[in-house]
Amino acid sequence: MPVNRYRPFAEEVEHIRVTDRTWPDRVIDRAPLWCAVDLRDGNQALIDPMSPARKRRMFDLLVRMGYKEIEVGFPSASQTDFDFVREIITEGAIPDDVTIQVLTQCRPELIERTFEACAGASKVIVHFYNSTSILQRRVVFRADRAAVEAIATDGARRCVEEAAKYPDTQWRFEYSPESYTGTELEYAKQVCDAVAEVIQPTPENPIIFNLPATVEMATPNVYADSIEWMSRNLANRESVILSLHPHNDRGTAVAAAELGFAAGADRIEGCLFGNGERTGNVCLATLGLNLFSRGVDPQIDFSNIDEIRRTVEYCNQLPVPERHPYGGDLVYTAFSGSHQDAINKGLDAMEFDADAADSDMDDMLWQVPYLPIDPKDVGRTYEAVIRVNSQSGKGGVAYIMKADHGLALPRRLQIEFSRAIQEIAEGSAGEGGEVSPKEMWDAFAEEYLAPVRPLERIKQRVIAAEEDGGTTSIDATVKIDGKEAEISGSGNGPLAAFVHALGTVGFDVAVLDYSEHAMSAGDDAQAAAYVEASVAGKTVWGVGIAPSITTASLRAVVSAINRASR
C-alpha cells in the first residue's frame, strides 16, 4: 500500500502541545448540554432525505426523549427544510423548553432566508459556519487567513442585523470554524474571538463555539488537547458555550467526544445511532448510555431503546447494525459458554442478594458479568440475553431452561443435557447453528419426558406415615412393555416406596440424588422433580413434571428407568 502518500497529523496541520493538560485526571460526573442534529447533519447524509412526515416523526421522537436543543434543518438550502421549519413553528409543535437550531452559511442572502424561516419562533439558535482549515483555504477558497476570517465576521454582523428585525424571538448564535481539526489552533481561536467581538455575548446570553471534527484526523487525545487549549485561551470564556461535533472517520468519535468533554467542553452535537456524512456523527445513544452505565444521569430517556431504534430506522431508511452499542439486536446476547455461565451465575447472585436484602432486584446495584447495563433498563427483556449455538455450554442451556421454561436443572443434569444440545447445534447444516428455546424444549421433552417404554406409570395411591420417621406405603398401577401390572411397596417416603415397589417386578433402581421445585408461583403451579438414579448399574437422570410434587417425583423415576433402557 502507498503509505508514502500520507503523513502524520503534526506535519499536515501542527503539533499540538499541552504539556500541563488536566483532562486525563478528570472524571465525567455530569451530562453535557446535548444538541441532536439528526434532522440536518444526519438528514443531508441520507440516500433518500427524509420526507416531511419522516422529519416530523424524528422531531417528535427527539422531543419525547428530552433533547432541549434540536437542529431542525438548513432552511436556506432546501425548500423542504424551509417548509418543515415553518410547519413546526406555525403548528405549535415546539415545546416551550425546546430551542430549535438552524444552519446557514455566511452568505447574506442565505442568512436572510434563514431568519425568514424562523419568524414567529420563541427561541432559536442560528448556527453559521465557514471552513477554516489549511486545506480548504488553499483548494476551496484560495484565500488567505484574513479573507477567511472576514467571511466569518461578515456573517456574524449580518446575523446580528437580521435578528434585530425579529425582536419577539429570543435569538442565540452558534459559530463553527468548520474543518476545525484541520485548522491551526491559534488561527481557530483568532477567528472565534473575532466573531465574538461582533456578537458581543454575555454570561447570560453566551455564544456557542462549535469545534467540529468535520473530518476525524488524529487520535482522540489530540482532539482533547486541542479542546483544552481552546477552553483555556478563548477570550471571554465565561460568555462561551464550547461545543463538540465529532465525526467518526477513524472510528473514535465517541472517545473524542468523551475526552473533549473532560477537556473543558460544555456541549455535544450528534445523531442517534451515529448517522451522518461518511462514517457518521458521534452516536448520541452511545454517549448517553455510557454515562448511564456509570451512574450519571444523561438527562435523556433511553428507556425504550427498541422504539427509538425503530423510529430512527424508519426515518433514516437505514438499519442499525446488530452490534451497535446498546441498541443493536445482539448487544445483550451471549453465545459463548463461559460468558453464559457467568451471566447466569451473576443473575442468580443478584436474585439471592435481593432476597437477602428484602428488596426488589430492580432496585439492586447492577453487577452481572458481560452486561454493562441491565437490558430491562432500556426496555429489553432477558429472553435474548443468552442464545445457544455450538459455542455454548451448560450455563446458556441452564439459563434458557429456567428463564423460558421454568426448570432449574441440577448442575450435573445441566452438563448432561448441554451435550445433547451441542450435538443438535453442531448438526445444524454442519455450521454450528443456533438452537432456539422451542427447539431446546422439544429436545428436552423428547429426551426426558416422552419415553413410555419399558415403564409407564398409570396411577398410584399413597398411604403416608402418621408420624415422622414412619413408613409410607404405595399401591401403583403401571405398564411394563405395554402390559398393565399392579405393584406395591413401602419406604420412608413416596419415592422410596415406589422404588421398593419397582424392585418387586425386576427394576434395580437406587436414587443417588433428588431435587424438586415449583415451576412458578401460585396455587396452580406445576412441580418439577429431578432424580439421578443408578438403574441396573447405569447412572442416569430422570425428570418429572406434574401438578403434585409426589406425582412429579414418581414420573422422574420412571423417566430415569426408560432412559437407562435406551
Curated annotation (Swiss-Prot):
Family the entry assigns: Belongs to the alpha-IPM synthase/homocitrate synthase family. LeuA type 2 subfamily.
Subunit structure as annotated in this protein's UniProt entry: Homodimer.
GO molecular function terms attached to this record: 2-isopropylmalate synthase activity; acetyl-CoA C-acetyltransferase activity; magnesium ion binding
Pathway: Amino-acid biosynthesis; L-leucine biosynthesis; L-leucine from 3-methyl-2-oxobutanoate: step 1/4
Residues that, per the record, bind Mg(2+): D41, H245, H247, N281
Superkingdom of origin: Bacteria
GO CC annotation terms, alphabetical: cytoplasm
Domain Pyruvate carboxyltransferase span(s) in chain numbering: 32-306
InterPro entries associated with the record: 2-isopropylmalate_synth_dimer (IPR013709), AIPM/Hcit_synth_CS (IPR002034), Aldolase_TIM (IPR013785), IPM_Synthase (IPR005668), LeuA-like_post-cat (IPR054692), LeuA_allosteric_dom_sf (IPR036230), LeuA_N_DRE-TIM (IPR039371), PYR_CT (IPR000891)
A biological process term (GO) from this entry: L-leucine biosynthetic process
Cofactor(s) for this UniProt protein: Mg(2+)
EC number: 2.3.3.13
Function per UniProt: Catalyzes the condensation of the acetyl group of acetyl-CoA with 3-methyl-2-oxobutanoate (2-ketoisovalerate) to form 3-carboxy-3-hydroxy-4-methylpentanoate (2-isopropylmalate).
Subcellular location: Cytoplasm
Catalysed reactions, as listed in the record: 3-methyl-2-oxobutanoate + acetyl-CoA + H2O = (2S)-2-isopropylmalate + CoA + H(+)
Swiss-Prot/TrEMBL keywords: Amino-acid biosynthesis, Branched-chain amino acid biosynthesis, Cytoplasm, Leucine biosynthesis, Magnesium, Metal-binding, Transferase
PANTHER family per the UniProt record, alphabetical: 2-ISOPROPYLMALATE SYNTHASE (PTHR46911:SF1), PTHR46911
HAMAP family, per database record: LeuA_type2
Protein name, entry field: 2-isopropylmalate synthase
Region annotation Regulatory domain: where it falls in the sequence: 451-566
